[in-house]
């Protein structure tokens, strides 16, 4: 241990260590265990982390194979040097559940948390592969909806995570297109009455700094680039006219290992 260093310097040094290594070190002493669970330290460590890329082939795969799907790329230095044959050995915890040992695909990533669908489309699962922590969430109409994980972007050390649900079918379909949001702090879904279903998603969503982005279309067929801001009481929607790319390559999910704790009401998930 770094026993001879001031605590603030020790914390600064440890914040530069990859989260996967910190996870193995957390039982070294009580002080480090507490430090690695401190939201301020976790956020600082996340800000210094290298980004990896998960290749998602959209077919069901066992989560025991998750490590074979990860290609390590440090996006901070990608402009200067990039060799796709070079990777970092990142070993993550597998998803352990005998009833659902496969997921259909990874939906989105936010702060080291992966939002996934199970093969039977009965539930969502939020999963931190670095810590092994999971949270199961009941959801309906998963074949007809798009989901994205995000949070309210504020100056607090601990983010308030949410899941946004939009329909992917036009309004004249028989599908329920009401927008919904899942609050981790309350463990419940609620309908966003103030969000008009004037458009529907036509692409997978991505999350950046807590906000959601995707291509959408209104009922006349006009394509838009949509940005969703997660707010304390719901969401704010901003759109601009844009052309969806004619060709989409393999679906990729960027991923950064982190020590973020999944909250469940006032408790942490297992």
UniProtKB/Swiss-Prot annotation:
PROSITE patterns: FBOX. It comes from the Eukaryota. CDD domains: F-box_AtFBW1-like. Residues 1-45 form the F-box domain. PANTHER family: BNACNNG10540D PROTEIN, F-BOX PROTEIN CPR30-LIKE. This is Putative F-box protein At3g24700. It comes from Arabidopsis thaliana.
